[in-house]
Amino acid sequence: MFDIKLINTEFDDVIQQKIDTKTKPLGALGDLETLALQIARVLGKDKPQIRNPKMMVFAADHGIADSGVSIAPSEVTTQMVVNFINGGAAINVFTRQVGFDLEVIDCGILKPIENLEGVIDQRLGAGTGPIHKRAAMTLGAVKQGFKMATDRVELHHQNGCNLIALGEMGIGNTSSAAAIMAALTGMKAEDCVGRGTGIDATTFKRKKMLVEQALLMHHCELDDPMQVLACLGGFEIVQMTGAMLAAAERNMLVIVDGFIATAAALAAIKINPNVREYMIFAHQSDEKGHVMMLEFLQAKPLLKLGMKLGEGTGAALALPLIQAAVNFYNEMASFADAGIEI
């Protein structure tokens, strides 16, 4: 479905030698050195550059939200999309600060927003089905979502972008992400479900019960990651998954945000494992399950700030660190350049 090249490690020794001979002790820049190696593998060993980075925020509603798994009603998804367009959300503040170009994509909120310019229409429906009662969507909708996401990534690629970051908005989407995590890792639902928007104990118990119910209902169809997305996914999660795969196919880097985005990343890796090396995991969120999912993927996030907002906020904050890794690799003098003998 996606022709993703296995990362070329042929020049790892050359890249590592360039890193090791900078004017610093070996390993002194820690995880930035590992990051620089990854970036040079993808974007080129000589002088990699981050070009036209794009923050893509995908929004959609979830049928399970009507069963009381969140403190917020589904209408908040639409209200937050309006907030994004008006520039008033955390993701707007952070993307302005770090120089990310932001776009907002309606993948399937309850109702289209009329008379609001700036929202990109990639609707797959008016919210998903309640996953504890029936499939979230058809397999055809998953494939359509992949096509939409691919077309959008291709547009950015044609405009010179070589790095995308993915954020989301969707009341109820932590339930969907937890179900995807459980299905694709084999972990227990109770270990994957967290408190999301800050729900109380009663709501938390209900949320775990409904996710377990969803996993039992769709059990016979959960061997295939595409079917997992159809049964348990969200329209925004599907399109994030497709965008990750499409970006890797085009030799672009992908910044993965928090819990929801990591569930999409997990699905993408199950579909095509080669996508993994194109992913940079931005942060460890405070949502229960994220640590275990990161460990399952053997992913070491750049930041740990106790955040659990979503929207792509962690991914936005990671961009300066990614740029710092590129800059030290390209611009820092070697011992020979500096005339330092050791």
Curated annotation (Swiss-Prot):
Its EC number is 2.4.2.21. It comes from Shewanella halifaxensis (strain HAW-EB4). Keywords: Cobalamin biosynthesis, Glycosyltransferase, Transferase. It is an enzyme of class 2 (transferase). The active site is at E311. Catalyzes the synthesis of alpha-ribazole-5'-phosphate from nicotinate mononucleotide (NAMN) and 5,6-dimethylbenzimidazole (DMB). Gene3D superfamilies: 1.10.1610.10, 3.40.50.10210. Belongs to the CobT family. Pathway: Nucleoside biosynthesis; alpha-ribazole biosynthesis; alpha-ribazole from 5,6-dimethylbenzimidazole: step 1/2. It catalyses: 5,6-dimethylbenzimidazole + nicotinate beta-D-ribonucleotide = alpha-ribazole 5'-phosphate + nicotinate + H(+). One of its GO terms (biological process) is cobalamin biosynthetic process. One of its GO terms (molecular function) is nicotinate-nucleotide-dimethylbenzimidazole phosphoribosyltransferase activity. The keyword Methyltransferase does not apply. This is Nicotinate-nucleotide--dimethylbenzimidazole phosphoribosyltransferase.
